């Protein structure tokens, strides 16, 4: 609700994003730091996990997260991943074609603001454009279009129940999730 209230104060969504996300004093410029301070204090491991997952938008397994961060894949990491999942920042995904107890599990960053901040706002802080034109320039970039497509995919997965109701198949059993397969002797790795 807070984000929607902030957007409603502007004449258009475009103006809101430009002002809130790309002006130096914009609310979304500092919201990332506020979120982590309020949820996790000054524990840097949580930011490191989020940054790693933001750089890997299709998710990572626990073993890959541990290897990339140079930490053990044991209890502490599991607890930190659980904390981030409980806070709504990430979600453990099982491929839709696997049983619920599958060991093939990936953690994916699902918080819409954090995904936008890490992929778009933080990335745009490194570029120089005229004030008030950053979002316009960004909207035509391939990286933005790629982010937009993934965001639509995440939105659909998060709201699959409403989508199934609207499309009229809510009474039919179905599974939701990404399709990914590990590379093996018979098949290359793939992510859909």
Positions of the model-derived regions?
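Short acidic, hydrophobic short linear motifs in intrinsically disordered regions
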Residues: 56-68
């Amino acid at each position: 609700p807070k984000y929607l209230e902030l957007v409603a104060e502007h004449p258009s969504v475009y103006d809101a994003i430009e002002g809130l996300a790309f002006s130096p004093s914009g609310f979304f410029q500092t919201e990332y730091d506020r979120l982590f301070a309020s949820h996790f204090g000054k524990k840097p491991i949580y930011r490191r996990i989020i940054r790693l997952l933001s750089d890997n938008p299709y998710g990572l397994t626990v073993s890959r997260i541990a290897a990339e961060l140079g930490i053990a894949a044991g209890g502490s990491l599991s607890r930190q991943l659980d904390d981030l999942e409980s806070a709504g920042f990430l979600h453990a995904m099982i491929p839709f074609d696997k049983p619920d107890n599958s060991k093939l599990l990936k953690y994916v960053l699902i918080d819409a603001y954090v995904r936008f901040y890490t992929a778009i706002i933080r990335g745009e802080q490194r570029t120089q454009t005229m004030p008030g034109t950053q979002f316009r320039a960004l909207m035509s970039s391939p990286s933005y279009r790629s982010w937009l497509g993934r965001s639509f995919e995440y939105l659909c997965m998060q709201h699959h129940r409403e989508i199934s109701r609207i499309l009229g198949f809510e009474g039919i059993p179905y599974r939701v999730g990404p399709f990914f397969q590990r590379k093996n002797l018979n098949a290359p790795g793939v992510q859909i």
